[in-house]
Structure formats: structure tokens, C-alpha cells
Swiss-Prot record:
One of its GO terms (biological process) is defense response to Gram-positive bacterium. One of its GO terms (cellular component) is extracellular region. It is found in: Secreted. This is Bactericidin B-3. The modification Glycine amide is found at residue 37. Belongs to the cecropin family. Keywords: Amidation, Antibiotic, Antimicrobial, Immunity, Innate immunity, Secreted. InterPro entries: Cecropin. It comes from the Eukaryota. Cecropins have lytic and antibacterial activity against several Gram-positive and Gram-negative bacteria.
Amino acid sequence: WNPFKELERAGQRVRDAIISAGPAVATVGQAAAIARG
């Protein structure tokens, strides 16, 4: 068991999640800004 390998894999998973969630977060933020006027 290599903790660094595990960390690397976890980091990639987090990065993938951020990359896929990024556009959604931006859209929600934009919608909220528009709603606030």
C-alpha cells in the first residue's frame, strides 16, 4: 500500500469533480447574480 499513490488518485478524483462541477457552479453563480439584480 502506497499512501502517495492513494493521495494522487484521490487528488485526481477531486480535480475531475471540480472540473465537471465548475461550469455548473459558474452557471448557478451567474443565475444568483442575475436574480439579485
